[in-house]
Amino acid sequence: MNNIDFDAIDLTKEAPVTEPERQYYYIAKARKYVSEKAQEIGRNLTFCVTTFGYQMNARDSEKLVGVLELIGYKEEPDEEKADFVIYNTCTVRENANLRVYGRLGQLGAKKKKNPHMFIGLCGCMMQEPTVVEKIKKSYRFVDLIFGTHNIYKFAELIVTRFESERMVIDIWKDTDKIVEDLPSERKFSFKSGVNIMFGCNNFCSYCIVPYVRGRERSRNPKDIIREIEGLVADGVVEVMLLGQNVNSYGKNLEEPMTFAQLLQEIEKIEGLERIRFMTSHPKDLSDELIDVMAHSKKICKHLHLPVQSGSSRILQKMNRHYTKEHYLEVVRKIREAVPDISLTTDIIVGFPGETEEDFQDTLDIVRQVRYDSAFTFIYSKRTGTPAAAMEDQVPDDVVKDRFDRLLKEVQQISAEVCSVHQGTTQDVLVESVNDHDPSLVTGRMSNNLLVHFPGDESMIGKIVTVYLKEAKGFYYMGELCK
């Protein structure tokens, strides 16, 4: 990718049919159009990408930014001033859609004042036909609409918009194609997300993701290794391997490979210091993976293992394919193999039919596992999922009471678990200057906890040894070891 001379691409010829060569052609063509528009208005064109949702969306946004910068746009953090505004949407919760509609209405007024403005919508929300129909009818000023399966065609879609001067819509219901060797602008120079697979086959009854992200597709391991080697050569010391369920990696490859085997290959990459991954589904967390984690020198001592509920009855209704007992056995195995592992989780309160007894099972699993932290959610009915049609929706006041009780329990345990590291020394990857005190820097330990300590900008991206002086509940104050 870095060796492509886009100015040398002959635009008088037809676009190639193979990927990613076809997108290189359209990047060159888009550069021409953007340059002409900038000359016409007498200034650089600007863009603002807003990301809704989780880490895979953030990784997709880095690709959007990479293309926009390569074709000549300059980043503008204030969308009010940008010439090209893109919303990379998330649709896990229904209110996320409402947020996008609200902000779109405001953008429409801005576009009337800026005739050069483009508005693009992509991501999971665009995979819903009802959403696209609503945008076509009520938000006709939108220029680009595309989904999750063809984000690699971004440059081609921009060219189509320049040439047609009409709304461009390109939504694929599904795909088996993976095109990754394209521009990307990383948020951090020292760490990066790496997609290892796309889609999900689990169909949890409350979740829309399999319907908008498609079925599981694993990347070729050689391509993953090549990408990480390139990142390390560019200064990256930590990678986060991304997938809806990384534990099921490799099942659809011509030569099947397990996630544990992939981790062993990544471990061999010289210069790579740390490996993280998410998300892991408890039903697929194998003994092989636990063994690899136990013997690794690079895999971080942190595992995000979403439990969702402690009730086996509710887990069955959720279509999670494990019981409370199975989950606790997985936790026992991982703790036995990696005693200093940090465990975090996701928990949903108020799933349809949840009784007080079910909720007590959830509190019990929180007390038994003693998570370092937990993301707690009130169940949100999601149109298009089986759970949305279930009877016995739990009254709001009951859900709110349970949520408050769970949060109190989680926070108390988290503070106790966090404090056990006080007085120890830990290796820390320095990530930033502290937001509240510029005399401090903020770093992340292997177990994913943050520590703030005296330092300066020159330390960012380096792994240093820090003494943890004081636990502050969910983070530490420390000092650099001499």
Task: Locate predicted features.
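Proteins enriched for Cys/Gly/acidic motifs involved in redox and nucleic-acid/cofactor modification
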Residues: 1-249, 288, 303, 325-336, ...
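Radical SAM enzyme [4Fe-4S]-AdoMet core and its adjacent flexible, acidic
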Residues: 54, 250-271, 318-321, 381-412
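Short flexible coil/turn linkers enriched for glycine and charged/polar residues
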Residues: 187-190, 200-202, 299, 309, ...
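Terminal RNA-binding accessory module
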Residues: 389-482
